[in-house]
C-alpha cells in the first residue's frame, strides 16, 4: 500500500517505521511546512499532525479522493464541518482519539462505570501524564474519557485543572519520556 504521512512528529515517524517493516511504501512524509503536497500517488493518508493543521490536511485528502485515518487530537471543534466536507465529497475518514485496543476497552469500561455512578454522589477527576513532546493538553484520550462520563452522568462538562462540583477536572502533566498514563478518580 502507498501511504502519505501527514505529520511527521513522534507518531508519524513510528508509523513510518512500522509501515516499512510491513512492506508498505511511504510515498510522502509531510512535516507541515508549506501547503499540503500532491497526494495523488498515495492509496491512503495517515494524519497525525497538529491541531492547527488537521482540518486542512483532512480537507486536502477529501479533495484528492484519498481515504484518511486521523489520530490528531485537539481540533474537534471543527469536527462537524469536516464530517460535512467528507460526506459532500464522498470521502472516507476514520478518526479516533486513541487507536490502542487497550485504551478503547478502557473507554467502554469507563462508560459502564459512569452508568453505575449516575445516581450516586460522586465527583470525578482525571489525571494524565505524557511525555514532554505531547503537544495537546489535555490529551484526546483524557477528553474522550471525560466525555464518556458526561454522557452517562449528571456531569455538565470538563475543565483543565480542578473542576467544580458538576465538572470533571482534568489535570494534565508533561514530563520526560513517559509513554502515557491516565488515572481516573471518583470521590464523594
Region locations from a protein language model:
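Rossmann-fold NAD(P)-binding glycine/threonine-rich loop
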Residues: 59, 72-94, 101-115
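Beta-loop-alpha module in the N-terminal Rossmann-like domain of NAD(P)-dependent dehydrogenases
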Residues: 37, 41-63, 74-79
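C-terminal substrate-binding/catalytic lobe of Rossmann-fold NAD(P)-dependent oxidoreductases
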Residues: 2, 10-39, 118-187
Amino acid at each position: 500500500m502507498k501511504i502519505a504521512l501527514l505529520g511527521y512528529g513522534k507518531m508519524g515517524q513510528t508509523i513510518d517505521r512500522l509501515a516499512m517493516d510491513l512492506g508498505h511504501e511511504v510515498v510522502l512524509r509531510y512535516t507541515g511546512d508549506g501547503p499540503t503536497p500532491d497526494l495523488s500517488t498515495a492509496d491512503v493518508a495517515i494524519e497525525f499532525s497538529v491541531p492547527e493543521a488537521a482540518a486542512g490536511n483532512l480537507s486536502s485528502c477529501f479533495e484528492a479522493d484519498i481515504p484518511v485515518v486521523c489520530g490528531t487530537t485537539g481540533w474537534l471543534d471543527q469536527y462537524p464541518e469536516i464530517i460535512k466536507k467528507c460526506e459532500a465529497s464522498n470521502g472516507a475518514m476514520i478518526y479516533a482519539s486513541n487507536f490502542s485496543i487497550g485504551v478503547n476497552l478502557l473507554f467502554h469500561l469507563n462508560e459502564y462505570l459512569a452508568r453505575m455512578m449516575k445516581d450516586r454522589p460522586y465527583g470525578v477527576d482525571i489525571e494524565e501524564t505524557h511525555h514532554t513532546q505531547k503537544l495537546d493538553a489535555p490529551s484526546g484520550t483524557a477528553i474522550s474519557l471525560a466525555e464518556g462520563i458526561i454522557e452517562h452522568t449528571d456531569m455538565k462538562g470538563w475543565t483543565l485543572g480542578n473542576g467544580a462540583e458538576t465538572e470533571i477536572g482534568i489535570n494534565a502533566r508533561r514530563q520526560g519520556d513517559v509513554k502515557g498514563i491516565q488515572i481516573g478518580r471518583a470521590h464523594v
